[in-house]
Amino acid sequence: MNVINCEEVKRDEFHTEKYYESYNIFGAHIVTEDEMRGVRFTVWAPHAKAMSVVGDFNEWDYEQHKMLQVTEEGIWSLFIPHIEEKEIYKYAIETMAGDVIFKADPYAVYAEVRPNTASVVFDIKGYEWNDKNWSRKKKKKSVYKEAMTVYELHFGSWKKKEDGTLYSYREMAEELIPYVVEHQFTHIEIMPLVEHPYDRSWGYQGTGYYAATSRFGTPHDLMHFVDECHKYGIGVILDWVPGHFCKDAHGLYLFDGTPTYEYKDKDVQENPVWGTVNFDLGKREVRNFLISNALFWMRYFHIDGFRVDAVANMLYWNKEGQEQSNEHAVSFLRELNEAVFAEDEDFLMTAEDSTAWPLVTAPTYEGGLGFNYKWNMGWMNDVLKYMECAPEYRKYIHEKMTFSLLYAYSENFILPLSHDEVVHGKKSLLNKMPGDYWDKFAQLRLLYGYFFTHPGKKLLFMGGEFGQFDEWKDLEDLDWNLHDFEMHRYMHDYFKELIALYKRSKPLWQLDHSPEGFQWIDANNNEQSIFSFIRQGDKQEDALVVVCNFTKATYENYKVGVPDFEYYNEVLNSDAEQYGGSGQVNKKRLKAIQEPFHNQAAHVEITIPPFGVSILRPVKTRKGSKKQDGSKTKVRSNVTSRGKR
């Protein structure tokens, strides 16, 4: 890290200009000055009356190591010789009211393990990365036209040791990575790893934005974890929270005794949703703090993406009874995304946004917010409501399963089956399913089949892959003992086969963001709650036919319109006995009958299983059949696309 001496910094740069290397100025840096080794401490506290550095080295006496104010706008700095790495410290701040408060360093790269709250001097330099091959391979791929399967996890509750203690970053590399590789996930998405005092905030209420939480080890240990992920071809996405922060006394809240990182106006300062305070995104120093932080994680931890939390809460003010857009946040998000993509054009910037704000994933030069992905919260809510409904009543809410295709190409979407839907009394995905024991597993297999064949990249929260029965319990690990039960083993086998099929089937991801990649065969069979559609790849011969039955009825010789290929094979049936189903499968090759049906040139007659999904793949290339106007048959959607980034 290239530490910049404060006296050499242009006086107003941090305060008035875009300065995205603020971590080079602020924090605690091990340096040599005047031939003496020590630590240079620098902090921004614009309304402090006086500042000092305290720690074990001076018995926490705030009179000993007074800091020098080096800019009128409140940058303070001090070099203390003979202090070494691992020294704990805080800033003692004399406020304008005459009080002395003690704060952790906003730019510290390491902190004490909770419940202790001091910052720790740490030399973040020195880790030797081994992921050049990963970087080269990533450059050759498009984030839009590749398969993407994201495994969302909470680091502290995926798995614990027998004595209930946490695995370290290095130990998790040994435990987690082989599991992720076995399941063929392309990425892991980790809930926030910034330092945070309260375990049950899951990291979303942070105090140390530059400090990887010490619960699991040192920053270098986390670098090793990311390095190992890259070694095995796994991308790493971090949850990141630039909208709000916690009110713990040692953190950013009222940092110098006055609103510093948060809004001054009480009406917009408080975030009543989480009991936190909102970052003042109109303040240049706060923007530089946050955007520098994003680039810090990219540069020093080689992170491949951010899932930006609570974008909806940022875009609109929290004022009661009002829905007024926050132009500070809009401008900040655009600036953030421009800075991130200038650093790495292949980075993943995903917005967790439940609003109808337009052009979230459009480039800023087109008037968009500049993200390249957005969680499809509407799809998630509609589909889960549909699945929770008793099967005999699903025909009355049929549109919940078709509505998403009316806007599927308005943004670049990720379909999330996330942690938010399996906690706080919402039940696990398996337990959301109505009916008896067998019905629940059959419908979860069906849901996953629909999930993997619907346009959009995929995200699943941990435990869903084997049918976790209880909802997520953040203080415990997953119920790994469920593998002792046959139906959970069947579910696990099915999920692995489904994800493998997804990854090797270009029609399921190649045109995720183009209307050319999807066509309804029959979207209107509400009486039987059966949906059928085509997924299409770049090549016309790359096509899959998907049929989903959301009731327990079995149908023999059911006619489904298909593109004009000669034969079809069933490549996956969720009702197969090896997955715990009843065995209503289509074993034989299906000959396409050359009679139009469902606006297709031909049709097949198949067995449709109860609560089942059947995926058909053409055996031979298309015969070049002609439509009545003489043109070749072409799979095409009736929805329009805004276009890709």
Curated annotation (Swiss-Prot):
Record field: catalytic activity: Transfers a segment of a (1->4)-alpha-D-glucan chain to a primary hydroxy group in a similar glucan chain
Question: Ranges of Polar residues compositional bias?
Answer: 636-645
What EC number(s) does its UniProt record assign?
2.4.1.18
Q: One short Pfam family name for this protein?
A: Alpha-amylase_C
The biological pathway it contributes to is:
Glycan biosynthesis; glycogen biosynthesis
Keyword set, alphabetical order:
Carbohydrate metabolism, Glycogen biosynthesis, Glycogen metabolism, Glycosyltransferase, Transferase
Q: Does the keyword Transferase apply?
A: yes
- Answer yes or no on keyword Transport: no
Where do the catalytic residues lie? Answer: 309, 352
- Purpose: Catalyzes the formation of the alpha-1,6-glucosidic linkages in glycogen by scission of a 1,4-alpha-linked oligosaccharide from growing alpha-1,4-glucan chains and the subsequent attachment of the oligosaccharide to the alpha-1,6 position.
Which protein, by its recorded name, is this?
1,4-alpha-glucan branching enzyme GlgB
Q: Which organism is it from?
A: Bacillus cereus (strain ATCC 10987 / NRS 248)
